[in-house]
Amino acid sequence: YFRVGYTLSKALDDGPDALVVGRSGNVQNSYDANAERGFSADDQRHRFTAAWVAEPRKFELSQSWLNGLVNHWKLSSIVTFGSGRRLNATIAGDPNQDGNTYNDRLTNSRNAFTGTDYFSTDLRLTRNLKLSDRVKLDLLIESFNVTNRTNKRVEISDDGFFNSAGQFVAYSTNPVGMNGKYYPGQYQVNETFLEPTNAYAPRQIQIALRLNF
């Protein structure tokens, strides 16, 4: 069989999922919680998946050993493509002097930036062995990301839920100071702003046995 799925979505919220453990719920301005409304950390605009299974018909050959060799095979695959996930850019430090560091933004909204896309193909080859009328054994060899595509991500926590997205925007090396405080403040973009610093898993291969009874 062959199945295809496509999702076009847009997710907005005013904070991380309540089930995400260890994620800060601090807002930039405690007097204006509505300003936190923006793209959700798990917002992904496009997602495409295709799955197929190929199981050839049974061949009736003259030699029994040939029948056992060419029959009872199955090949299946899942192809996944997803557009980039959301990233949040903040300023290192505490420019609004509220005592809460690493949550202040410039003029951008929360999760205003987008990371790199994702593409992966998984492949499985299965051989079915009939041990008895009630017992069957499946021999499987599977490969995840079989094409070994380098799926980059901006930082290791960028997985759609655990998404802090790093402090991309830093203080200028020559800020305007007043009594030791930054006012009004000059900022510069880090050289690594939105540059991928990590990657999802490369090609992986595993062999398995599954007993059905």
What are these regions (language model features)?
Residues 1-213:
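Short, solvent-exposed micro-motifs at the edges of structured domains
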